[in-house]
Amino acid sequence: MAEKIIETAYAKINLGLSILGKRKDGYHEVSMIMQSVGLCDEVIITEGEGIQISTNLEGLTCGKDNLAYKAAALLAEKYNITPNVHIILNKKIFMAAGLAGGSSDAAAVLRGLNKYWNLNLGDDTLETLAAELGSDVPFCICGGSAIAKGRGEIIVPLPDMPETIVVLAKLRNLDVS
């Protein structure tokens, strides 16, 4: 077990989104072009008791409803691990802005705990686990440029986008996710 793992959780934007219909499971069938951006959170994993979450962002739930907590609980359950971790979320991604802040943190927790617990899981396995947590989480495992299909769980990598300056704005009282 490592002493401390630090993972970067990059925000993502949708460059294109097509809603292709409603699925039997209640989700929408989509085709999206997704792109990681430089805005990111930092996820630090250290020893703790059970699953502890702390954050620098006031108002963010740190309990069992937090997606990072759910990611840790899922991985511990699937691989029969008694979790003793403290997960610190240093948030810079805006909440409810459609930038996958929670999803990217959950993906970073999966990647980080994979290392912390020496599970040696491949990206495909992590993406499959990520799909149990949410539609954006599988993309956030590897990030970059990709097409996401299905409900977002089918990831088809694209060539890297050239470096581009993007300005993101979020109105204070408008939640988009």
Task: Name every feature range the model reports, one short phrase each.
Residues 2-8, 12, 16-18, 22-32, ...:
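ATP-dependent small-molecule kinase catalytic core of the GHMP/sugar-kinase superfamily
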Residues 76-86, 112-131:
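Phosphate-handling active-site elements
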Residues 68, 97-123, 139:
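DPxDG-like acidic metal-binding loop motif
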Residues 3-83, 96:
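N-terminal beta-alpha supersecondary unit
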Residues 87-95:
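Membrane-embedded alpha-helical segments that form the functional core of polytopic membrane enzymes
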